[in-house]
From Swiss-Prot:
Organism: Vespa orientalis
Enzyme class: hydrolase
EC number, as in UniProt: 3.1.1.5
Record keywords, A-Z: Hydrolase, Lipid degradation, Lipid metabolism, Neurotoxin, Presynaptic neurotoxin, Secreted, Toxin
Protein name in UniProt: Orientotoxin-1
Residue ranges the record marks as coiled coil: none
Entry function: Neurotoxin of presynaptic effect which degrades lysophospholipids.
Main subcellular location: secreted
């Protein structure tokens, strides 16, 4: 049993289109290869950058924004001047704890992720606190392939 539905080394994006609420999955490579940058931002109600912590069914959609799912990204959010949203806006993992959620523009977030080749938390990271049930991290103390707290 793999508690982490996105366990490979690719950032997944979930696109919720207004027409049918269908979830379309993209990778950054796909976006780059097909030059879908503007097309994605134009057609998308919501774009989620999923940092491999697993989101289950507990998605709270807000049209026109990107949700960064990791409080460990606070440093990056601050560094690149992406404003955190009000503290009462939360996004919860199914079976996990609520995590602070940051909202930035769709275009800026896709550009940021593309430039930095961002890859998020792995469920199997040693030394990362988990909830003891699913094996998923609490608040994403480490990031991989991104400049992070522990320098990995």
């Amino acid at each position: 049993f793999n508690p982490c539905p996105y366990s490979d080394d690719t950032v997944k994006m979930i696109i919720l289109t207004e027409q049918n609420k269908k979830q379309d999955f993209y990778t950054l490579d796909t976006i780059g290869e097909h030059n879908q940058f503007n097309k994605l931002t134009a057609k998308s109600q919501v774009v989620f950058i999923v940092w491999q912590t697993g989101i289950g069914d507990a998605i709270t959609a807000r049209a026109g924004y990107i949700f960064l799912l990791d409080s460990g990204l606070a440093m990056l959010v601050d560094k690149y001047q992406m404003a955190p949203v009000a503290s009462d806006i939360k996004l919860c993992n199914a079976g996990c704890y609520c995590k602070p959620t940051y909202v930035i523009s769709v275009k800026k977030a896709i550009q940021f992720a593309w430039e930095h080749k961002c890859v998020g938390i792995r469920c199997s990271d040693p030394g990362v606190p988990t909830d003891g049930l699913s094996g998923r991290p609490h608040y994403g103390e480490t990031l991989h392939k991104v400049r992070s707290y522990n320098g990995k």
